[in-house]
Amino acid sequence: PEKVDVLISGTGPAGLCLAAQLSQFQDIETMIVERMPSNIIKGKADGINTRTMEMFQAFGFADKVKRETYWVNQTAFWMPDPQNPEHIKRVGRVQDVADDSSEMPHILINQARLHELFLEYMKNSPSRLEPDYGWEVVDLSIDHTTDDHTVTVTLKDASGINWWATRTIRANYVVGCDGAHSKVRKAIGGELHGDAAHQAWGVMDILANTDFPDVRQKCLISSANEGNVLVLPREGGYIFRMYVELDKLRPDEKASQRKLTQDDMIAAANRIIKPYSIDVKEVVWWSIYDIGHSITDRFDDVAEGEDRNPRVFTAGDACHTHSPKAGQGMNVSMQDTFNLGWKLVHVLKGRANPRLLRSYSKERLTEAKRLVETDHKWSRIMSAPTTQAERDGTQEPRIIRQFKENLEFTGGTAVKYDASYLFAASAHQALAAGEEIGRRFHSAPVVRVSDAKQMHLGHVAEADARWRIYAFAGKSDTSNPGSKIHQLADWLETNTNSPVVQFTPKGEDIDAVIDFRAVFQQTFDQVAYENMPSLLKPKTGKLGLQDHEKVFCVDHKGLGDIFDMRGINREKGCMIVVRPDQYVSHVLPLDGFEELSAFFAGVLQVNSAGKRV
C-alpha cells in the first residue's frame, strides 16, 4: 500500500506485540517492515517475566507458552568457598516468584518461538497481517501542515531481492521498534545517552555434560577472581544458556575488537565454576557483547517545549538498552508497545482525542529510567567482589538481599504510573486496597456463574483495546431488581450520562468500548443468573447471541476469595475501572455514577461515525 495508518519498523518482540494488537482491527491499515529477510531462528533474548505472561493471556497464548517452556521456580546463588576461595559453593536459594505476586510463572523461551506465536496470532486476525521482510526504514519526514498521512517514509530493500529498490509510504503514525541503532529514532533527532561498563560478556546456548549440580536451576555464580556466570536452563530438559563474564575493556574499546570466540567463553566458564566443569558437546548459538546502559530523552517526535501531538514513536531497544542480566529487555520492550497499542486504536477509531498519544512517552520514559537505574545497581553488585563477612557466612550476601528486594521489579509488577487524567485520584482507594490505582489489575480466582467454571477474573481481559469495569457486589447483593449492581447496570445501559451510552458508536455491540462484569459474594448456586440485569447478559455479534460470561462469584473451593485477597470492602463493594492495557484507572463506590461519567468524559470522545481523527 502507498498509504497506511500505522507503519511499524522492526519485527522484534516490541514490533510484533504492537502489530498483533492492531491486527485485530480490519479498518486500521497496518504495515510492519523488517530489514532481515525472514524471522529469526535461534538465539537472542529468552526470559519472560510474570507481567508479560499476563499480557500473553490477553493474546490467548499464555497456556501454550506455559506448556512449552522452562519455568524458573527458584534461583541458586554460588560464591567462593571460604575454606578454598578458588572453588565455588552454594550459599542460598530463593523462590523466584513471590507467593501471590502473579498467577503466572516466570519462564524461559526461545525468542524465535515467541515471534512465531505473535505471527500466528496476526495471521489468524481479521486483517490477516503479515510482515514485509527485507525492507528497512532509511528516512522519514513529517508534514505538520496536514492531518492526512502526515509522515512520509522511505523504505529500502535491505536484502537485494528487489535490486536494492526504494519505495515511499505515507503513514498517519510510525513506530520505530528497530533496535539500538534505530533509523526511526535518528530521523526524529533522538539519541541514546548513557554509559558503558567497559566489560565484555559472552552468551551461549549449549548442549553439555557437567557435574555442576544446579544446572537445571537458574544460578548466579560469583568466583573469587575469575568473574561471574549466569546459568539459565532452557526448555526440553537438556539445553542451557550461560552468560559468562569475560575481559575488562578499555574505555575506547568494543568487545568485538577482542576477537573473542566460543572457546574463550567455555574456558572462562570452566575457570569460574571450579571445582566443577562442563564438557560442551555442541554450541547451538553464541554471541559476545559489551554492557551498556542508555536511554533517550523522549519516546516520540515532540521536542521539549513543543505543544503538539506526536506522530512518530520509538519502543524497546530503540529507546532504552541495558544488560541482559536483569532479564528485562524483551519484557519492557513488549510492555512499551502494549501501552501504545490501545492508544493508537482509540485515536484512529475516533474514540479519543490524539492528545492521548502524549501519555505514551511520559509513562514509559519514567519506567525506562527506573529500569536503567535498577540494572546499573544490579550489574555493580553482580560484578563486585565478595566481602569477608559474606564469605564466612556471618552476613547474607548482598546479591541475595538485592535479588529479594528486586523480585517485584523483575516480575514486571512494580510498575506504578504517575497521576494523570488517565488515572483518577485515590479518594476511594480503601474500597479495594489491593487494586492500587496506577498499577496493573492484580487478578484473583473467581467462579463463572453460568457454568461454575473456576478461573481468574483477569483472564477475561483480551488485547482488544476495550476498557473494563469490574463491579464487586456488597454482602447482601444478589442482583435482585433494585440492588446496587442492578442500579449501576441499568444506569450504564440507559442513562444519557453513562459512558457506555455516550461513547459506544451506533451500530456496535454495547460492550465494544467498555466491557462491564460483576462479581458476587455468594456461591454460584445462590446467585440467580436469570435475575441479572440485561447489561450483564448482552446480545452481541452479527447474530445477536447472548453472552453468558460476564457474571462471577467468589471461589469457595479453596483457591482464594477475591474480596479477601485484594482487600475489597465486603459491606459496600465497589467498582474498579481498568484500562485496555490492564492498569487500574479508578476505584469507585457502586453508586459513583457522576464520578465515573466525569472520568470517561476526560478520556474518551463522542464519535458515533467512528471517523478517523
Feature roles, as predicted:
Residues 41-128, 132, 143-145, 232, ...:
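Active-site-adjacent segment of FAD-dependent monooxygenases/related oxidoreductases
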Residues 2-4, 161-173, 177, 308:
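Core beta-strand elements of the Rossmann-like FAD/NAD(P) dinucleotide-binding domain
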Residues 301-305, 345-506, 522-524, 572-574, ...:
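C-terminal helical "tail/cap" subdomain of flavin- and related membrane-associated enzymes
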Residues 133-151:
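A conserved short coil-to-beta-strand element within the FAD-binding core of flavoproteins
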Residues 290-314, 318, 439-465, 533-570:
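FAD-binding beta-loop-beta segment adjacent to the flavin cofactor pocket
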Residues 67, 120, 173-291:
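Conserved FAD-binding catalytic core of PHBH/FMO-like flavoproteins
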Residues 11-20, 118, 176, 283, ...:
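Conserved mid-domain beta->alpha element of the FAD-binding
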Residues 2-33, 37:
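N-terminal Rossmann-like FAD-binding beta1-loop-alpha1 element of flavoenzymes
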